[in-house]
Amino acid sequence: MRIFGYARVSTSQQSLDIQIRAVKDAGVKANRIFTDKASGSSTDREGLDLLRMKVEEGDVILVKKLDRLGRDTADMIQLIKEFDAQGVAVRFIDDGISTDGDMGQMVVTILSAVAQAERRRILERTNEGRQEAKLKGIKFGRRRTVDRNVVLTLHQKGTGATEIAHQLSIARSTVYKILEDERAS
């Protein structure tokens, strides 16, 4: 029996360190830890794919938390079934559960459904917060790009930089930068 570890974060801004430390503390060797920095909504993850190829019957995979293996109930169940068919057990350190046996798989299925429901609630609250912010005039996303040709046309007509900035709702420094870039080219 070999013990492997798996860790995943959803974004590149998040850190894998805590999860890696947890599986190491549970006895997993560093060269047997597989990681991904990707959304759990997709099961096509490089680290997970390598782990799938590496494990054999009798092996155990340790994951810090249930939602680190997958975020969607169907995908989670599919992964657990796949590992089970290979004779590989998955154990979730923080949750204290394992896919060994029928009871373990039932608990995992229930917990993954609960985790999915919690994510939906979080998404609902996030969307409600965004809608409230929009009503208050808070804008989201990247600022719109400036049409350089409009700036240049207004300048050629004799409009000053301050007035151009005011008309286009952009910073005066942006107007100067566009004019400077035009002179340099």
UniProtKB/Swiss-Prot annotation:
SUPFAM superfamilies linked to this entry: Homeodomain-like, Resolvase-like
Active site as annotated: 10 (o-(5'-phospho-dna)-serine intermediate)
Name of one Pfam family that matches: Resolvase
Any one GO MF annotation of this record: DNA strand exchange activity
Keyword field contains DNA-binding: yes
Domain Resolvase/invertase-type recombinase catalytic, chain residue ranges per copy: 2-137
Keywords: DNA integration, DNA recombination, DNA-binding, Plasmid, Transposable element
InterPro entries: Homeodomain-like_sf (IPR009057), Recombinase_CS (IPR006118), Resolv_N (IPR006119), Resolvase-like_N_sf (IPR036162), Resolvase_HTH_dom (IPR006120), SSR_resolvase (IPR050639)
One annotated GO biological process: DNA integration
DNA-binding residues (ranges): 161-180
UniProt function note: Resolvase catalyzes the resolution (a site-specific recombination) of the cointegrated replicon to yield the final transposition products.
Family the UniProt entry places it in: Belongs to the site-specific recombinase resolvase family.
Protein name: Transposon Tn1331 resolvase
Organism: Klebsiella pneumoniae
This protein's encoding gene: tnpR
